[in-house]
C-alpha cells in the first residue's frame, strides 16, 4: 500500500550557510562599521545581536534575504521578543521550528478525512503518515494540502510503494 509522510523541517545545513553568509555581509557593510552586529547559532536557536533596534531590523533583513536565497522558508523562524543587553545593545532569540505540531497534525488529518479521498492519515510523532491504495489518490492529497495549509511550510517524504 503506497504511503508518504507529511513533515515540516528546515534544512539546518542551509540555515548554517545562510548565517555564515549573513555574518560575512554584516562584517563588510559600511552601515555596520564599528558595531557588534552578528548572528549566532546554537542547535535550532539563532541569536541576533545589534547596537540598537534599527540595526537589529537590518540584521534580520540580511538574514531573511540569505535564507531566501538558499531556499529556506522564512515561516520556519519563530521570533522571540527583543531584549536589552548592557548599554544600548539589543538581542533577539529566533528559534527554527521543527516537526508538525499537534494542532497542525490534527488539522491535516481532518483535512484529509474531509476531502473524501480514499486514504488514511495517522499522526506519528512529528509527522503525519498518509496511506492509500492508489498513487493518484496520494498525489491529489499532496496537491490539496499544498493548497489548504499555507501557514506552515510542509514537505512530503518517505514515499513507499
Curated annotation (Swiss-Prot):
Gene3D superfamilies: YajQ-like, domain 2. Keywords: Nucleotide-binding. InterPro entries: DUF520, UPF0234_N, YajQ-like_sf. GO terms for molecular function: nucleotide binding. CDD domains: YajQ_like. One of its GO terms (cellular component) is cytosol. Belongs to the YajQ family. NCBIfam families: PRK05412.1 (NF003819). Nucleotide-binding protein. This is Nucleotide-binding protein Bcep1808_2648.
Amino acid at each position: 500500500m503506497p504511503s508518504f509522510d507529511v513533515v515540516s523541517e528546515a534544512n539546518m545545513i542551509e540555515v548554517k550557510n545562510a548565517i555564515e553568509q549573513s555574518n560575512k555581509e554584516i562584517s563588510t557593510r559600511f552601515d555596520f562599521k564599528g558595531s557588534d552586529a552578528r548572528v549566532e547559532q546554537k542547535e535550532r536557536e539563532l541569536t541576533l545581536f545589534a547596537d540598537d533596534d534599527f540595526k537589529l531590523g537590518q540584521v534580520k533583513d540580511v538574514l531573511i534575504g540569505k535564507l531566501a536565497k538558499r531556499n529556506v522558508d522564512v515561516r520556519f523562524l519563530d521570533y522571540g521578543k527583543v531584549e536589552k543587553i548592557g548599554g544600548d545593545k539589543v538581542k533577539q532569540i529566533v528559534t527554527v521550528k521543527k516537526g508538525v505540531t499537534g494542532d497542525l497534525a490534527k488539522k491535516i488529518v481532518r483535512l484529509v478525512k474531509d476531502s473524501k479521498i480514499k486514504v488514511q492519515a495517522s499522526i506519528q510523532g512529528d509527522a503525519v503518515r498518509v496511506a492509500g491504495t492508489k498513487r493518484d489518490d496520494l498525489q491529489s492529497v499532496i496537491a490539496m494540502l499544498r493548497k489548504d495549509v499555507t501557514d506552515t511550510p510542509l514537505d512530503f517524504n518517505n514515499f513507499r510503494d
